[in-house]
Amino acid sequence: MQWDIVIGLEIHVQLATQTKIFSGSSTAYGAEPNTQANAVDLAMPGTLPVPNEQAFRYAVMFGLATNAEIGRRSVFERKNYFYPDLPKGYQTTQLAQPIVGPGYVDIDLADGSTKRVRIHHAHLEEDAGKSLHEDYHGMTGIDLNRAGTPLIEVVTEPDMTSAEEAVAFAKKLHSIVTSLGICDGDMSQGSMRFDVNISLKPKGSDTLGTRTETKNLNSFRFMEQAIAHEVERQMDILEDGGVIVQETRLYNGDRDESRSMRTKEEANDYRYFPCPDLLPVEIDDAFIEDARSRLPELPDARRARFKEQYGLNDYDAGILSADAKLAAFFEETVEHGKDAKLAANWIQGEFSARLNAEEKSVAEAPITGAQLGAMVTRIADNTLSSAGAKKVFEALWTGENNDVDAIIEAKGLKQVSDTGALESMVDEVLAGMPDQVAQYQNEEDPKKRKKMLGGFMGPLMKASKGQGNPKLFNEILVRKLGG
């Protein structure tokens, strides 16, 4: 039987506020366990929550950026359940009247098409603490530093039909929240966590199948793997005549396997009721307009500008505009390097490869946009060859020297572009390769002739000690060999 895949996402976005959603405790990452949890976070008797205005502002900014309705009246409820890292015995969240209503995000797919994914709603809530299982001799430690950290939980409609679409949406959302500055987007620190709801239905059927939820995926790669794994698992069960159990599952990316955590609860299992400690929050026009005035350039607008302003193709503009820090680095490079296409090639090539290899962010790169721009300028004005540029880049990256011209001078990398000198080298090399010259001139196939030119370039680069301008060498060769 053929199946349709149905996917919806729940994405927890940790807001980049300085303090927690209902207390004054710091949200800084990496502190010693239980050093950033005050009496409110610990649910001590007599404590009362005080809402964090910045969390509401960030939520409204998110709603505006995702074409969503803003809930003018926002209400908090208590979601009741027991877990060791939830000291109150309930989570303060939103259900009936969330701060962000229906919206949508358009995603770009590999085949060049665009798809609209609807957002059902996004609500504010507090994060739980963290259970620590290592170094406790068979016991579990509880760190409540994270308890009370503000989250937006984004809930999509089940509009996605493949892992590709789900990952594309997750990447687009990551791009939006980091561009807004409301989340640092560091998934290794739990700043964004993805829950994937998956079900299968017979191809063409309108009746949805039973869904499962795979929780706490913290990378795009794991999300893709988890979806593929769960789809295959459900197909195997259904095709063997079995029944899918509605449950929450945990995926292990290292082993490519999942296990059941618990039977999936319904909303009434959590006994939601309005939080008596928090009044409804009224969002007025002035607050919304203030949030709107704080919106930066968003990824789609930045992409369009990069295409128009710098003449980039759609692919390059998409890659360079998706990440706000990478976009800023690109623009700094172009400011100092002038040639936008050349700058784009180096950033997407050598620069990004080194970042990935060393697991660094753009902010941690040991080279600045100004330095890369200076190098791009020297490539564009034919001072540097591609091979020489790689040596300059290496010197910049390792901190050997931070001045491009000084590196070129010290390493003798200045490219020879004097046509008289280059012609003399070409004449000398051709004189020493009469058989190859004759073979080239007797060849009628243009493609083969073009390929045969490469046989002359090696000796020419050797004669010029690697400093001859390859483009000029090629032009001189074609002219002297007769086309």
Swiss-Prot record:
It catalyses: L-glutamyl-tRNA(Gln) + L-glutamine + ATP + H2O = L-glutaminyl-tRNA(Gln) + L-glutamate + ADP + phosphate + H(+); L-aspartyl-tRNA(Asn) + L-glutamine + ATP + H2O = L-asparaginyl-tRNA(Asn) + L-glutamate + ADP + phosphate + 2 H(+). It is an enzyme of class 6 (ligase). PANTHER family: GLUTAMYL-TRNA GLN AMIDOTRANSFERASE SUBUNIT B MITOCHONDRIAL AND PROKARYOTIC PET112-RELATED, GLUTAMYL-TRNA(GLN) AMIDOTRANSFERASE SUBUNIT B, MITOCHONDRIAL. InterPro entries: Asn/Gln-tRNA_amidoTrfase_suB/E, Asn/Gln-tRNA_Trfase_suB/E_cat, Asn/Gln_amidotransferase, Asn/Gln_tRNA_amidoTrase-B-like, GatB, GatB_C_1, GatB_Yqey_C_2, Gln-tRNA_amidoTrfase_suB_CS. It comes from Marinobacter nauticus (strain ATCC 700491 / DSM 11845 / VT8) (Marinobacter aquaeolei). Keywords: ATP-binding, Ligase, Nucleotide-binding, Protein biosynthesis. Pfam families: GatB_N, GatB_Yqey. GO terms for molecular function: asparaginyl-tRNA synthase (glutamine-hydrolyzing) activity; ATP binding; glutaminyl-tRNA synthase (glutamine-hydrolyzing) activity. Its EC number is 6.3.5.-. Heterotrimer of A, B and C subunits. Belongs to the GatB/GatE family. GatB subfamily. Allows the formation of correctly charged Asn-tRNA(Asn) or Gln-tRNA(Gln) through the transamidation of misacylated Asp-tRNA(Asn) or Glu-tRNA(Gln) in organisms which lack either or both of asparaginyl-tRNA or glutaminyl-tRNA synthetases. The reaction takes place in the presence of glutamine and ATP through an activated phospho-Asp-tRNA(Asn) or phospho-Glu-tRNA(Gln). One of its GO terms (biological process) is translation. This is Aspartyl/glutamyl-tRNA(Asn/Gln) amidotransferase subunit B.
